[in-house]
Amino acid sequence: MYSANKIEDEELAAKLPEPVGYKILIAMPEMSEKTEGGVFVPDALKKQEETASIIGYVIKAGSEAYSDIDKFPSGPYCKEGDFIIFRSYSGTRFKVMGREFRLINDDTVEGVVEDPRGYSRA
């Protein structure tokens, strides 16, 4: 249900907030218009999936993200440019120029995926 969208619009990138502390700024992939089987996804379902989304693209991390050695003894879970899986409904949601972003805590990241296409909430 997700598409692999990265931030390529320079005007949009310039308007994004700088994450502070332990926060990670992520871009939310846009929802596909159709399922893998070719069925169109209704707008209400797309909105529900966007709200409960579990996949994001890491734009930038705050200066203190993953700095707690006791909590992250093996280092950061993710880096800029990674697609991540995070807890549903987590983070502060906001839109810039019609595109959704979130600020999440560093310990909310649960996994890294190479390509978000083909993933959906269970």
Residue ranges with predicted function:
Residues 1-122:
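Compact, glycine-rich, soluble single-domain proteins
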